[in-house]
Amino acid sequence: MQDKLIVRGAREHNLKDITVELPRDRFVVITGVSGSGKSTLAFDTIYAEGQRRYVESLSAYARQFLGLMEKPDVDSITGLSPAISIDQKTTSHNPRSTVGTVTEIHDYLRLLYARVGTPYCPICGRKIEKQSPSEVTDRLLAGFPDKRAILLAPAVRGRKGEYKKLFADLRREGYARVRVDGTLYELEEAEKLKLEKFEKHDVDIVIDRLTLRESDRSRIAESVELGIRRGEGLLRVLLPDAGEDGGAHEELYSEKFACPEHGSVLEELEPRSFSFNSPYGACGDCAGIGAKQEFSPERIIDEKLSIAGGAIIPWTKKGADAGIYYWDKLKALAEHLDFDLKTPWKDLPAKAQKAVLHGPGEAFEVVYRRGGKETMRFMTEFEGVITNLERRYADTESEFMRERLEELMELRPCPTCGGTRYKPEILAVRVGGLNISQTSGMSVLDADAFFQQLQEGELDHAAIEPFLKRHTGGTAKAHGPLHYEYDLGTFGAAVAAPILRAIRTRLKFLVDVGLDYLSLDRTANTLSGGEAQRIRLATQVGSGLTGVLYVLDEPSIGLHPKDNGRLIGTLKNLRDLGNSLLVVEHDEDTMLEADYLIDMGPGAGVHGGEVIASGTPEQVKQDKNSLTGKYLRGEMKIEVPAERRPGNGKFLKVFGARQNNLQDVDVSIPLGTMTVVTGPSGSGKSTLIHDILHATLARELNGAKTTPGLYDRIEGMEQLDKVIEIDQSPIGRTPRSNPATYTGVFTEIRDLFTRTPEARRRGYQAGRFSFNVKGGRCEHCKGDGVMKIEMNFLPDIYVPCEVCHGARYNRETLEVKYNHKTIADVLDLTVEDAHEFFEAIPTIERKMQLLLDVGLGYMKIGQPSTTLSGGEAQRIKLATELSKRATGRTIYILDEPTTGLHFEDVRKLMDVLQRLAEGGNTLVIIEHNLDVMKSADYLIDLGPEGGVRGGTVVAVGTPEEVAAHPTSYTGEYLRKVPGIVAAEPRARGEKAEKPAKAKAPAKKRTKKQTELVEAD
């Protein structure tokens, strides 16, 4: 078998006809500066070809569903295995997808509860026992005397099919009627029905039609017994006139599960009963999502204003006449409940607030007056603002109105199920004393301990008590058991053994990749890219496949240095199973642990696309041409700043933060500094900074419609004028967006073209040089430059427009030139070339210089934003912020800005961040990178662990002070950083005070805070 994967003549994107040999069944890391071609080689060439060859082997019919990848621009690839990509861009956005469902642990939980779960009555908590036919007969006669009844035996429940054969068989057996999907039919009629084959149906056999009289007990008992036998333990009884208002009512009886006191019946327990994606288990109110979009009083009411002053926001907006229409009713309501419409909302009594929002629930008198005279007097009702908005939202057919109303809504836990997603009768089924929602709500680590104790028969009440008070339901609450059962019994233990083994194996893999803090019910759309990737990595390790090529994109993202060892161990386990690993990575530990290292470069974009060095980590480390090698051997490094900024003496203070796992923490951020928030994965960093601090600042300073997490108060906001979050999200969602449009430089370039003699002679305005509007763009391709051709079972192809040949503009527009270049030529310039070309235009030259400063000189200014990496998008945003005049009152929030960045890129990034801080601005950065930590003025370390074991402030202070902290994991790793000398930690009570001006043992600070230096 070939022992090498050989790529010959790769020219995809910026690759320069490279040939590279990779050892098979080894752990290979590809590194290099951002934009050097790492992902192009790993994903767009090697993975794309592996996937394409596999899909091409399938039938043409199958290919049109899978989507064939385009053949990469490469001469040949040999030694290629089937490829699986584990990147960060395929996180599920489905609210039904959770950690448990993605890892398949939830599937095993459903099986466990269906096979060994103990059902209890959701009303009284009594253990549900079987019902015999005689007990069912007694219940019917006692509960519905002299009522007409139709006894039905369930034959089909929620299954697909046409059931013609079933109907024919039933007629031969002597039955006369059936009920199909809730409608009664003669069997002759039923046989003529054309049921949808691929839709789910319910079919019940009519056993008997009778009146429930004591004199007919023997007939009733006989029919009940037959019905239960024919329905395999279940019997439905339809009572046509026993319901409310004389309507129909239906009873369900089970030979197996029913509470003798309340009659609570549980259908036969099956795995689908415990799925929140199935109508058999899901809460009927929220359909198993666990949350509902509801109108938020916080978004509807401005508490600082009075009703007369416009407190009811949707009724005071321009164009909303509801305020005028309801004004007389509101005045009458105020008289009725004795409150003043001119009183600020926050000072109104709770009863008045409730009446305005939800209606008073009673009629009251309204007097209409016009010109001071009474014109009408009558009794009326007031539905309430929220009820009014709900009605309008349900009735409107206008997409615009729907979107406007959705701005006033937010996702809130379902009031019926309390966010558990399940019906109360499903929550009443327990294993080891806990229901399925309670076990899903545990962290991975707690769940592993619980199932181990269950497996070993060592469970007791003390072990499950911390989990009993939550996940019991909302208004449809499930009563706790009267008597708990902790063990499974001999039979149950034998049935559960293989299920528990499978659950614990998968939990162990999640622990190994550093995700022990996640709960199994955590929705997938709330996971970071790194977390989602490591979950899929754990799933792949659990699959036990061999001979596969795994291509991974920075699996260490979001991991604290303390968790890196476990991740690397998992990657090696995957390799040891007999797989090849190709990992795009910038983490130093991962590089040094690899079997083989490839360094791409030397620069980015047109300056990259070459293999600079390859070999073992030690060989690359000693390579004189390798930039990565210079950093690995310490010849180049990011220097520790000579001193820490003390800040401007003012603070932004958060008190009582307690969202998610935060444990009532107080933190102080010194303004005018670069503050880095650190801590293990899941310790509460994003909750504190994003969910509480950023959400509050965005609402108060920027007027955003955000809903912050739980906290007591935030002080110091008056010192700031705006908050800006600089993340790695795309700068635009369409190919029409590009660096030139985002930075605003395209507007200036178009204005420049309008001032050329030719444009003036023709009367062209700035719009003529836009490819987004009619006039100057090529109308054949609508300014896209390419035409999409659908190929059905072949991949769609994009070909240059045959009219403009990819230029995007029509011939007349391209006849206008500035310094011998058309507008299309200018958009095709790199930032470096554009900087030189527009040297005489200060406004454009300055913005190009800033893009150069952040390391984007290789990028074309007209490059579609959809092709930019997250790191590139973030640096464009940073350059745009640097181009603005510094006020010293802006706070910037960044979440792991070093994602996708090489050591050299981090150095450039730190230069830019230090420049922002030098302008007196405040930076708050969530980061695990030690180079960023050591460059900070102030650190806030959360922990000590993730999940329920985190959420507290472990240490605060300068990097030197945190390094001296005895229990901080961050401090432990900072102590190993050259140039950081541990200083005495400050007293805990001083955490909110002004950080000391700490000296670090480094050379005198130069103009740039972080610089590239040659080691002595």
Swiss-Prot record:
A zinc finger (C4-type) spans 259-286, 778-804. GO terms for biological process: nucleotide-excision repair; SOS response. SMART domains: AAA. Its main location: cytoplasm. Keywords: ATP-binding, Cytoplasm, DNA damage, DNA excision, DNA repair, DNA-binding, Excision nuclease, Metal-binding, Nucleotide-binding, Repeat, SOS response, Zinc, Zinc-finger. Gene3D superfamilies: 3.30.190.20, ABC transporter ATPase domain-like, ABC transporter ATPase like domain, P-loop containing nucleotide triphosphate hydrolases. Residues 315-627, 647-975 form the ABC transporter domain. InterPro entries: AAA+_ATPase, ABC_transporter-like_ATP-bd, ABC_transporter-like_CS, P-loop_NTPase, UvrA, UvrA_DNA-bd, UvrA_inter. PROSITE patterns: ABC_TRANSPORTER_1, ABC_TRANSPORTER_2. GO terms for molecular function: ATP binding; ATP hydrolysis activity; DNA binding; excinuclease ABC activity; zinc ion binding. Residues 984-1016 are annotated as: Disordered. ATP binds at residues 32-39, 679-686. NCBIfam families: PRK00349.1, uvra. The UvrABC repair system catalyzes the recognition and processing of DNA lesions. UvrA is an ATPase and a DNA-binding protein. A damage recognition complex composed of 2 UvrA and 2 UvrB subunits scans DNA for abnormalities. When the presence of a lesion has been verified by UvrB, the UvrA molecules dissociate. Forms a heterotetramer with UvrB during the search for lesions. PANTHER family: UVRABC SYSTEM PROTEIN A. Belongs to the ABC transporter superfamily. UvrA family. This is UvrABC system protein A.
